[in-house]
């Protein structure tokens, strides 16, 4: 077997990220027959062009997965996070998603997500130490067959 080198890339860039993503999608398609994968990215931009918040994730297999949601501290509590979530959830439903999932932490936005209809289905203690990682989900619509 060929001698392969493991290379650390702290900022892998789009090409390497795409290499891994495309190959995982290919394996998932081979196992499930589901080939559609939609990246999700909604962002808050000021009139001056400043980026002040955003949401990233993807839709696959009937689910929206929210990777990250962030709103600049001074803008929190003014509905911007809800607007970003609304946009992502609508995007997902338009692509036949019936549910959404995300992770947050006990020190994070748990209450925000509960108000939006998300429920905790799993917990990982001491992630990081002294805190809990929360796995949450929400039904967006009906499963259609």
Region locations from a protein language model:
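Acetyl-CoA-dependent GNAT
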Residues: 4-67, 72, 107, 126, ...
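Conserved active-site tyrosine of GNAT-family acetyltransferases
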Residues: 20, 113, 118
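Conserved acetyl-CoA pyrophosphate-binding loop and the N-cap/start of the following alpha-helix
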Residues: 75, 79-87
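Acidic/histidine-enriched, beta-strand-rich ligand/metal-binding domains
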Residues: 75-76, 99, 112
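Conserved GNAT acetyl-CoA-binding A-motif
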Residues: 92-105
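Conserved catalytic-core motifs of GNAT/GCN5-like acyltransferases
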Residues: 101-103, 119-135
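Generic C-terminal helix-cap and adjacent flexible tail
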Residues: 139-145
């Amino acid at each position: 077997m060929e001698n392969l080198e493991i290379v650390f890339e702290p900022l892998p860039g789009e090409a390497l990220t795409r290499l891994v993503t495309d190959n995982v999608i290919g394996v998932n398609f081979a196992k499930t027959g589901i080939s559609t994968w939609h990246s999700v990215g909604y962002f808050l931009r000021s009139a001056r062009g400043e980026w002040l918040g955003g949401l990233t994730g993807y839709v696959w297999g009937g689910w929206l997965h929210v990777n990250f949601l962030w709103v600049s501290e001074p803008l929190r509590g003014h509905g911007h996070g809800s607007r970003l979530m609304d946009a992502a959830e609508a995007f997902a439903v338009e692509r036949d998603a019936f549910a959404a999932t995300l992770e947050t932490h006990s020190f994070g936005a748990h209450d925000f997500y509960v108000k939006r209809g998300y429920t905790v289905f799993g917990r990982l203690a001491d992630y990081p130490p002294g805190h809990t990682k929360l796995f949450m989900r929400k039904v967006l619509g009906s499963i259609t067959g």
